[in-house]
Amino acid sequence: MEVFLFFGAALLLAVVLKVIFTPRSAKKVVMSSNPIDGIRFGGVMGFMLGDSYEFCLSRFKHLDIAIDYQDKTGDDSMIMGWGKNQYNNINAVRFIFEQKKLVSIVIDVDFSEEGIRDMYGILISRICRILKTEPMMSDSKQTAWASPKSGIILFKRFTPISGDEILLIQIGSM
């Protein structure tokens, strides 16, 4: 009888420890301090590539996220959420749909007001820390991370019209 009690207590302890120490999956991540901190392979802040157009619209509504416009079809369309001034250093997060499926997420990083000199290098370091992996390719204009199903690219671009430098983070399927 004592043996059964011992094994029962050990089993109960194992279950409790598993529940406490099991990390939450990326799908369960709802919000974080910033969209950059919410980057995962295949998604950002709970939105995942392949999610349906309707699901994303309902998620925007549920999370009370203001979006710029709604295309009723979801075919070859874009929704912009989290506009300027909602998060530090973020101009916008764009969700791109094809055939009613989320195919790409683009984060437009704003660093003009902060006056940070090497935001590109800082973002490379930050994304490496978040993803817990090094980039597969990096140069002075772009850096890429890859997983078997998706990839993340950090672009550094100069816009000739405004004379500003912009940084875009794109999450897409492989």
Q: At which residue positions do the language-model features occur?
A:
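Feature marks short, highly hydrophobic, charge-poor N-terminal signal-anchor/signal peptide-like helices
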Residues: 1-10
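Short beta-strand segments that buttress and anchor functional surface loops
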Residues: 78-85, 107
